[in-house]
Swiss-Prot record:
Chain residues that bind ATP: S855, R998, K1001, Q1020
Tissue and organ distribution: Intestine.
UniProt GO BP: cellular response to exogenous dsRNA; defense response to bacterium; defense response to virus; innate immune response; MDA-5 signaling pathway; negative regulation of chemokine (C-C motif) ligand 5 production; negative regulation of chemokine (C-X-C motif) ligand 2 production; negative regulation of chemokine (C-X-C motif) ligand 9 production
Enzyme Commission no: 2.7.7.84
Keyword presence, ATP-binding: yes
Residue numbers binding Mg(2+): D867, D869, D939
Stored Gene3D superfamilies: 2'-5'-oligoadenylate synthetase 1, domain 2 (1.10.1410.20), Beta Polymerase, domain 2 (3.30.460.10)
Protein activity control: Produced as a latent enzyme which is activated by dsRNA generated during the course of viral infection. Strongly activated by long dsRNAs at least 50 nucleotides in length. ssRNA does not activate the enzyme.
Keyword list, A-Z: Acetylation, Antiviral defense, ATP-binding, Cytoplasm, Immunity, Innate immunity, Magnesium, Metal-binding, Nucleotide-binding, Nucleotidyltransferase, Nucleus, Repeat, RNA-binding, Transferase
Site residues (Interaction with dsRNA), renumbered to this chain: Q154, D242
SUPFAM superfamilies hit by this protein: Nucleotidyltransferase (SSF81301), PAP/OAS1 substrate-binding domain (SSF81631)
Positions of the UniProt region annotated as OAS domain 1: 6-341
Organism field: Mus musculus
Name of the protein in its database record: 2'-5'-oligoadenylate synthase 3
Amino acid sequence: MDLFHTPAGALDKLVAHNLHPAPEFTAAVRGALGSLNITLQQHRARGSQRPRVIRIAKGGAYARGTALRGGTDVELVIFLDCFQSFGDQKTCHSETLGAMRMLLESWGGHPGPGLTFEFSQSKASRILQFRLASADGEHWIDVSLVPAFDVLGQPRSGVKPTPNVYSSLLSSHCQAGEYSACFTEPRKNFVNTRPAKLKNLILLVKHWYHQVQTRAVRATLPPSYALELLTIFAWEQGCGKDSFSLAQGLRTVLALIQHSKYLCIFWTENYGFEDPAVGEFLRRQLKRPRPVILDPADPTWDVGNGTAWRWDVLAQEAESSFSQQCFKQASGVLVQPWEGPGLPRAGILDLGHPIYQGPNQALEDNKGHLAVQSKERSQKPSNSAPGFPEAATKIPAMPNPSANKTRKIRKKAAHPKTVQEAALDSISSHVRITQSTASSHMPPDRSSISTAGSRMSPDLSQIPSKDLDCFIQDHLRPSPQFQQQVKQAIDAILCCLREKSVYKVLRVSKGGSFGRGTDLRGSCDVELVIFYKTLGDFKGQKPHQAEILRDMQAQLRHWCQNPVPGLSLQFIEQKPNALQLQLASTDLSNRVDLSVLPAFDAVGPLKSGTKPQPQVYSSLLSSGCQAGEHAACFAELRRNFINTCPPKLKSLMLLVKHWYRQVVTRYKGGEAAGDAPPPAYALELLTIFAWEQGCGEQKFSLAEGLRTILRLIQQHQSLCIYWTVNYSVQDPAIRAHLLCQLRKARPLVLDPADPTWNVGQGDWKLLAQEAAALGSQVCLQSGDGTLVPPWDVTPALLHQTLAEDLDKFISEFLQPNRHFLTQVKRAVDTICSFLKENCFRNSTIKVLKVVKGGSSAKGTALQGRSDADLVVFLSCFRQFSEQGSHRAEIISEIQAHLEACQQMHSFDVKFEVSKRKNPRVLSFTLTSQTLLDQSVDFDVLPAFDALGQLRSGSRPDPRVYTDLIHSCSNAGEFSTCFTELQRDFITSRPTKLKSLIRLVKYWYQQCNKTIKGKGSLPPQHGLELLTVYAWEQGGQNPQFNMAEGFRTVLELIVQYRQLCVYWTINYSAEDKTIGDFLKMQLRKPRPVILDPADPTGNLGHNARWDLLAKEATVYASALCCVDRDGNPIKPWPVKAAV
């Protein structure tokens, strides 16, 4: 759509549908840049001679949030430890850039789904450039890799750089903007914290600029970043509101471009006149030929550069644009630009009226002209300084009558002043004029230079993970003063409605995020639920609600004429079942959306910790209501459910909701052409679910919690979450309703107070894309730059999963990632070969073989963290009893070679050798580079090669076991010697049986979390064997019913006192020694589960089977073990003893 042919009223639509980047491409780019970030960070660790990457910052239009659809740019600034000063950046570049280019060539082979990679011609020395483009070529982003000196260090929210940063910059004798990359983060934050609508205006201005570029191809136009700053200046001086007319804003920016030869703009957000060297430099900069637009992060960079750029071409284009359709209102009248200090005014040819902020801030240069910077660090000031010689006023500014009147009043009582005092007096009077003039645009207690953006919190993605607690406290928690005012207003409203209503009020309840204690700074919601006697049941609410609401509105309209001091109140768009109001602080920095809802008192007053009567919910379900139609009736239960959460969990909720708000605000009116996203309340519940299942501690890592929730959001199509704290599946009506809900499409997030309300409904796609993008950012990195892991949480719970869905549950949540398993297999093969070839090379000891064991080798590993063994069989062990000798020396030798292997080979997975000083155990971990929760922990175990080279399907020589029996003093002492047999016993089983083993192991791990601290559970391997036994005795059907198999294993666990399970696949009673030993083992107290590879290993002995049996009894009646009619699934007919 052409800008000039778009009516003024349709500009928002033009921006939303034509200028915002395509969400699919944005998501793909974020994923690619996150992957590249990790690649660059890891590059530092390989080879100690290479410069270390301290951190990586993103800049450019992409990072500032001002990227246009089609093509845009991003800077990846790589801060290296080899740069100790600005000057160092000119050296040690060719080798560094060469290494990075090789890295890029490798990475660029697979930059990400739907993207192509191509190197570009670098526009400057000391940088690398390439382009990522969509497959169809319609969307692209130019990426610049810029190595830089980390002069600022780890950025801290709201902290200004120290003056010596800029004085050292100036003393480096750099060219203008030569080291601007060092200041990427403050530059990005300056723009990024602005309101969404202002960024839309920036997109509109840049779109106009690109149209000019196509017509003026030979002209050297100023960079588009200059127009971003000019747009911010125009908004700060003329508007300052979050909501405004795009046509009026565009008209103002073009008017400034038309008057560009008078422009002199700078900010003191990051630097100022306090330091003598910086102050003197700024004075010189402000005398440069107009336009002057100083970069707010780097004072050496005059982005406006009147001597270099053809602003005159832009000025001509701007002047010719004013009569276009985009500036015409529906009535045909042209929109007018904003008015304010430093902006064009009717009848004035220049911008000759400087901004002054206060009498104590005047700074005089050697010609007596004044320039001023703001003293308020919390604001983002812009300064128009045309009072220098090159921009002397040509036509006096139009006199302001109010200003003259002020001056006359002051002169009556004035004493004679020096020239300097007179100048200060002039400034002081001008301040009052500026503030009163701007009052039509801004709250009265904010100066004309403050912005809505200055109230916005910093970009979450750039907050270091260790600072998240402080970030929440400083930026997300609501103002206590405003909360107190709101409480007073609510009490007054309730008092008004109680006293004057013609209907009897039974009681009231406060809900919404304000009532739940999860309200964010800036804006939140409150539900005032008023229970009336006349509303006697669910069905009877609708007929009376309309008249009650009319009565409420009449009372409140009278009351709102004198609301609580410091607050304003207004009625907003109404809903059929509620009265909608908005309370706002007088400075408009905080607001509350208030819903007043008349409701039926279904629950009645409840004592703490008690459940509503089951008939409450059965009557709700029988009322034929719509989903969540009567949610207000359960407001107290909803509030109490969240109010009991620990304080840190509520902090995590605030962080998640802040991220949610950033995402929704960013895309509001943009691509959001589909369904609305789920409500923020859904993310509160998701946060509680994540914490309950993955942590449960009072103290925890906010970054780990946030990553867990973002991961669940990405898995939204599998979410199935509900609680039974208020309603129970034991009630037939509720059970039937829940079963019906559970058969619906995901996501399912049931309100814990109202089972009819699935709060998970909505479009999660955008949230999922943004969650993936945030995953590689600073906020989710640990101090050493590695990504923090998520908690171990699945999107659905086993006991809440329908029996018919167990196969799907296993495939989605329990099966490990196949690609990761392949990577692990390759890595383990490399490690095994390396150990076999290199260990004990200069010794008589030989590595006979290396065998893989554990769940990973058996094919029963779970998704997430699993275990495995590497058993190294050595020639120095000639019998069982020798296995413990020289263990420390052997472990030390293997460890040295493992570490060498780690250095010499490149792996697809992250390879970490444990540094534990344990002479018995050597461990290492293989972790996925992309799936943070996927890893395998290996134990390296030296062992005696008792079995030798066994042929497949053959039995060991009986002498192996007689020697074992004579040598063994502790049960299972030499089980590592039989790793191959243990592995083969499971690997030979059908795939579906391995799936059942996974299910049983997952259940066991969940029980372990619940039982933690109460006692030692049986070993997990024992449950694997019990599962095989259940299947063998239950018919050995390779395609069995998963719920029946699971139910059978649970039943055997309940009967643990009768368990006696063993196999004679590898050993038998035919040999007298073995036979006598087996009889002795089988006479031991139950349960007995003998290892089929090692008869000395009784896996049922000395464990708290009673605790496991209790959990098995609970699960036997859960949804995963009942059929569609709610009847318990029957187990297979299996005896507890062979």
